[in-house]
């Protein structure tokens, strides 16, 4: 899968079409002992080994190729996005190629879920292409924030349709797409991952219905699922102990939380209290809009308005720091 193939494949992609069911074999690197065994094996086994090696070579070649694509500055991003909207093919190609590494980063999060990394990247690239087509630079948000939603949803859609043991009925998939599309639109408008409450308010649907539908987009794996090349370990064996967190990630979380507390001091008291209660800061437990409203004697809608105002103010603070809302809340919302 070359960069040029990625750019031209948009004609084959329609996010609204139902995905075809595809059989896929995930190639894995074999050890020296396995290589010896292959040399004495049947022709079919040797061909399978050669295919695995070629798949790995193709992945490494692709990752090396996209490493030469320079990232765009915020100003360049707006410039090329405007040109792309006017039909400039060169600008469209530059937007895509400059964000291919974002696709790889997101695709790695979905490894070991039934699709090979290269297949995940290919699906994510389709989402990136559609994001370039739909992105509106005049809204003032970075392209990566908007593109992340398209990339994630195309990957998750592929996993949902190609790896589910029980496939969802077509009408359920279409209903789910409505919720996912609304979530993408809200993410561009609000510059953060929308909560079920915000999606429900936008669609005028009960929060419980939104939560249930979004759960259909999650993939559930048994803790006894074998992992690794030899399958000698189960998923349960590598699940992290929440009481013994990785020191590196704990340090990162602490740094983000400390910065967040400092930024909260720049908000007015009401905004600070609402955000603290909503996101579990300053000793509070995370609460819903309704719960926060009951605690501070405000309506759910008023709490939502204060939250939006507070997040908007935080975004302004982050822009001055050269950061974005995703960097602030990835500890709370990262999948």
Swiss-Prot record:
Renumbered residue ranges of the record's region Sigma-70 factor domain-3: 175-250
Annotated segments matching region Sigma-70 factor domain-1: 57-90
GO cellular component: a single term: cytoplasm
Name of protein: RNA polymerase sigma factor RpoS
UniProt similarity note: Belongs to the sigma-70 factor family. RpoS subfamily.
CDD domains, A to Z: Sigma70_r4 (cd06171)
Gene that specifies this protein: rpoS
Pfam family, one: Sigma70_r2
């Amino acid at each position: 899968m070359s960069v040029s193939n990625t750019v031209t494949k948009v004609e084959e992609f329609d996010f609204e079409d139902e995905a075809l069911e595809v059989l896929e074999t995930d190639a894995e690197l074999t050890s020296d002992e396995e290589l010896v065994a292959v040399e004495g094996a049947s022709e079919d086994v040797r061909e399978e080994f050669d295919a695995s090696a070629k798949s790995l070579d193709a992945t490494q070649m692709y990752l090396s190729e996209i490493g030469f694509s320079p990232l765009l500055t915020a100003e360049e991003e707006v410039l090329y996005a405007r040109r792309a909207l006017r039909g400039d093919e060169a600008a469209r190609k530059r937007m895509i190629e400059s964000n291919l590494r974002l696709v790889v980063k997101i695709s790695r999060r979905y490894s070991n879920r039934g699709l090979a990394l290269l297949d995940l990247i290919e699906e994510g690239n389709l989402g990136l292409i559609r994001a370039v087509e739909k992105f509106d630079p005049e809204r003032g948000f970075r392209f990566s924030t908007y593109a992340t939603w398209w990339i994630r949803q195309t990957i998750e859609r592929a996993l949902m349709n190609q790896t589910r043991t029980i496939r969802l009925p077509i009408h359920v998939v279409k209903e789910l797409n409505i919720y996912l599309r609304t979530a993408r639109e809200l993410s561009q408008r609000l510059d953060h991952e929308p909560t079920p409450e915000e999606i429900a308010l936008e669609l005028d649907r009960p929060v419980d219905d939104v939560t249930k539908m979004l759960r259909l987009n999650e993939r559930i794996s048994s803790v006894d699922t074998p992992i690794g090349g030899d399958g000698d370990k189960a998923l349960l064996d590598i699940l992290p102990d929440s009481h013994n967190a990785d020191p590196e990630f704990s340090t990162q979380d602490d740094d983000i939380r400390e910065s967040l507390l400092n930024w909260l001091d720049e908000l007015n008291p009401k905004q600070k209290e609402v955000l603290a209660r909503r996101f579990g800061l300053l000793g509070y437990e995370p609460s819903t809009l309704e719960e926060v409203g009951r605690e501070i004697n405000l309506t759910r809608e008023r709490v939502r308005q204060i939250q939006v105002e507070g997040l908007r103010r935080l975004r302004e603070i982050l822009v001055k720091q050269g950061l974005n809302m995703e960097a602030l809340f990835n500890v709370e919302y990262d999948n």
